[in-house]
Amino acid sequence: MTFEAMFAKVKELLSGADVSGIGEHLAYQFNITGEAQGIFYVEVKDGLLHVEPYSYNDCDAAFTCSAETLFKIASGQSDPVGAVFLGKLKVEGNIDKALKLKSLLPSES
C-alpha cells in the first residue's frame, strides 16, 4: 500500500469524528513506518478537525507506528494505550494530550 492510499483511508476513518466538545488545541504528528512510510498530522483547532499529509512543527505529540497498527487504532479495533504497551506504537511529547487521541477515534463495537 502506498502512503497516499493509506492516508486517504485514515482521513476517511477520522472524517466522522465529533470534535465539537474539544475546547483545546490538539496537534498530533504521525510517522508511519514500513511500506506506506510517510508523515501526516491531525489537528483539532476551533472545533474543527484537520488531517493533512504534512509534518507539524511543534506538535503536542508524535506517534510512530506501521500503517497496519494505525488502521487498527483508527478503526477502533485496537486501543492506542495497549499498542504502546505492546511496543507497536511509540509516543513522544505531551502524554496528557496524546491520551486525548482516544476521543477522536471510533469506539470498539
Ranges and model annotations:
Residues M1-S109:
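Feature captures hydrophobic
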